[in-house]
Amino acid sequence: MKKEYRGKFGNFVHEERKKEEETLEICEDILKNSRNEMAVAMRFLQSAFGALRPTVSGETDVMGTDGKLLFASPTWLLNTFIQNKVWINRMYLHELLHCLFCHLWNRKVKEESDQRLWNLAADIAVENVMDDLYEKAVYIRPNSFRREKYRQWKEKKNVLTADAMFYLLMECEENEIIRLEQEFRRDDHHFWYTPQNRSGMASHQKEWEEMRRKMQTEIELFSKEAAGDSPGLVGHLQAENR
């Protein structure tokens, strides 16, 4: 390669690396600001936010978690931030709630069909909590389809936990499952099923269960006013901690 071409190629590589570093820095700031905004608005979740470390990653097209890290796609982050940053907050909280309710380590998942239903059940459970969470940082008014489905399900189950939803979904026809997936499936669950995550199942689950119990105690003793606008979260914590 001639010297002049080597120089041009070197400049090109340098500029690309600089762009990547700038993009990474912007994405890290977006995640940091999202976490801080929600931690201030929902102080009872501060310890949980501290337990899940955000990282910008090319391993996902959206967002996902393995219970230790929160993986976020840089492309998705930038595009979503431009459209509506509340969606980033919701997805961040979506991942946190999966961890608190230990959806990642459920032992019901033995076959691929179970995995599909469990993924959907877990997403419905956390979306329902967020739709009942009247916090400006994460609130987007649920559409009529969601409201009607919640009404129907709550006629059968008092609290829409993932366990409860799993059994309700087993009664659904395929076309209804597809429609529900279009409405409620949001994040990337493939991190749940990696050999590394399954091997550390017991210890990770125990850590989040302990955090969940402490959170319920804190809300009941100190933060009733702070959690007053989130009956769905309180009900979920009580149901999961029984």
Label each PLM-derived region with a short phrase:
Residues 1-89, 96-242:
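Short, functionally important secondary-structure microenvironments
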